[in-house]
Amino acid sequence: LYISGGAALSPAVARTFFALGVPIYQGYGMTETSPIISVNKVGHNHPNTVGPALPNIEVRLGEGDELQVRGPTVMKGYWNREEATKAIFTEDGWLRTGDVCTIYPDGNIRITGRIKEIIVTSTGEKVPPADLESAITSDRLFSQCMVVGDDRPFIAAVAVVNPDEFKTVCGELGLDPAKPESLQDPAFRKAALKRIKTSTAGFPNYGVPRQVHCTLDAWTIDNGLLTPTLKMKRNLIRQRYTAEINALYDTLVKR
């Protein structure tokens, strides 16, 4: 029996293990909840969710679709940190997880992003990035992806390209994969955007990236762009690609 937690389970990874006859059960929790809140189980495994809440845990949606929980395994508070304790609990005693989610009628919980990570465009559209990024990386061309768009007129993306698939696409387009400039060739970028559009077909139009910057440089723990639990350090990635991100918007505005 394999349980996955700590970071979101990639749908591609889940499918691979399922095909090998090794089911993985994704769960979810926090240190403050000792630590499990929900988990999939045998006969009730939906890998795109973190399963239903444990029998002794109550869950609800708070403001902004934030997942809030209460139950006997939830902490009483932070030791000698009164202000932090007040901040994490609602007035009626529910713990704020900080995660945006959907709770389905069957009780399954799907985490769609962090409250602080929600992208708000300059037109006021709100886009939770996690689901969008997961959809994009379901395409084998993209191994990692971060979408951007805060205070911008539309959503764009920075994506790490799978080297093997990059070579395949370059061959189809008559480009040389050994040349770094092929990544930014208009033909390749058009092909990348087409694949992004296909993989995000179920999202509203305002949530689909209209521009993408591609790179072959993976984001890792060693280069400081991933946490030890393999979560993206969004601020650092944005800083690393500031010029490239600005260029995505400048290019479209000038057209």
Tell where the protein language model's regions lie, with residue ranges.
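Gly/Ser/Thr-rich phosphate-binding loop
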Residues: 1-45, 58, 143
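Adenylate-forming
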Residues: 74, 108-137, 166-186, 205-209, ...
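C-terminal boundary motif of the adenylate-forming
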Residues: 100, 105, 139-165
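Conserved C-terminal "lid"/linker of ANL adenylate-forming enzymes
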Residues: 119, 144-147, 153, 193-255
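Ser/Thr-glycine-rich phosphate-binding loops at phosphate-binding pockets of nucleotides
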Residues: 29-33, 97, 121-122, 227-229
